[in-house]
């Protein structure tokens, strides 16, 4: 079998983590089988669909490394195909125009609710005569088009994740609306209908989507049969849940891929984490995967049925692993946009080699790329604010004399090196007859404003290169008076 799968997002919002995870599973399955991964934009909701959302979806997929083989195809450009399919069902007597008003539908639901029955359409307009249709039209009623569903029919399929699935026609809520009212006789085709037409036309072999589509699958199988088409294989993947076991939503914070990017997650770290959201690798100890490596191992036998809990701590850990293993030059490229967004200036000697030295200093401490903004602030600011602990340190006996001695020693240096910096510290310890700890703490506070921070010598070298070490030492001396 030639594997052909699709990801079919609706451009009514930014690329969602759930849609992206579905895209990951489709991509992995396609690559595992040497198949085709198709992008289809389901923009039949003309009122809510926006081109900026389409762009966000496509940009997000590319950023994650989920490049598609065919598409993008836009449903809004395929309406003729859908309307012909609606007409075919009408001509074959498999669908009909329903003129039931919204008020009548509401009254029906209330009556069913009063009896303790599940809401469903009672198919009252399934057998209208031409005269009855004409009368409804004369009354100014609009219509929807419904596909006939046999209440006695049992719909069975073997789900690649969940095994045997079985639904009765009577569980599907009555005859299915496949097109809403419009100016033409075939109406405006709806989502549940057009996806089937597209999947038939694009020869989709496997439909891989979230478990919240299971009820749709039962209805859509009947549509495949109505058109005499081959029914694809179905795989319904687990939903993404929050740590309390509820479906992940905006109330849980970030849910769109572009938001994750802004928060400082790498594409590799995020897509690695999404791969493990519901799928277990054969080697349970292996957690770090490239997409290509995961594709070699990916099967639906190892996709879980239970919901996948979104664990921020696990995502942070995975992300940090990718950051720590990214070469300095590449990591610098990743960090520059975050520094620019923070308004940091690269003037005053902060050239590319200097930036790469800064990245080398900070990289091991980064969990997210955004961490570099706060950690590097002291290197992009002309002055630093003293922390409470830093102020106390400068009031320690001997701190002022130590800092004055360091400035004096710097006057003899044309270019500070690591060895020269170490020698200055040794000289000051000996000349001032103080412990090395006092010198190191005083110097750190003078340069960084705090008693804690990145490697002191490397920080000093970076600040020296852009001429900020002496001014900060002088500032600290003034603060120690």
UniProtKB/Swiss-Prot annotation:
Q: Which GO-annotated molecular functions does the record name?
A: ATP binding; glutamate-tRNA ligase activity; tRNA binding; zinc ion binding
Q: What does the subunit section of this Swiss-Prot or TrEMBL entry state?
A: Monomer.
Q: For the motif 'HIGH' region, what are the positions?
A: 9-19
User: Which residues bind ATP per the record?
Assistant: 250
Q: Does the keyword Nucleotide-binding apply?
A: yes
Q: What is its main location?
A: cytoplasm
> Which keywords does the record carry?
Aminoacyl-tRNA synthetase, ATP-binding, Cytoplasm, Ligase, Nucleotide-binding, Protein biosynthesis
User: Do you know which InterPro entries this protein is assigned to?
Assistant: aa-tRNA-synth_I_cd-bd, aa-tRNA-synth_I_codon-bd_sub2, aa-tRNA-synth_I_CS, aa_tRNA-synth_I_cd-bd_sf, Glu-tRNA-ligase_bac/mito, Glu-tRNA-synth_I_codon-bd_sub1, Glu/Gln-tRNA-synth, Glu/Gln-tRNA-synth_Ib_cat-dom
Q: Which family does it belong to?
A: Belongs to the class-I aminoacyl-tRNA synthetase family. Glutamate--tRNA ligase type 1 subfamily.
Q: Which reaction does it catalyse?
A: tRNA(Glu) + L-glutamate + ATP = L-glutamyl-tRNA(Glu) + AMP + diphosphate
Give the UniProt record's GO annotations in the biological process aspect: glutamyl-tRNA aminoacylation
Enzyme Commission number(s) from the entry: 6.1.1.17
Q: What is the enzyme's main class?
A: ligase
Q: Where is this motif: 'KMSKS' region?
A: 247-251
Briefly, what is this protein's role? Catalyzes the attachment of glutamate to tRNA(Glu) in a two-step reaction: glutamate is first activated by ATP to form Glu-AMP and then transferred to the acceptor end of tRNA(Glu).
PROSITE patterns documented for this protein: AA_TRNA_LIGASE_I
Protein name according to UniProt: Glutamate--tRNA ligase
Q: Entry's Pfam families?
A: Anticodon_2, tRNA-synt_1c
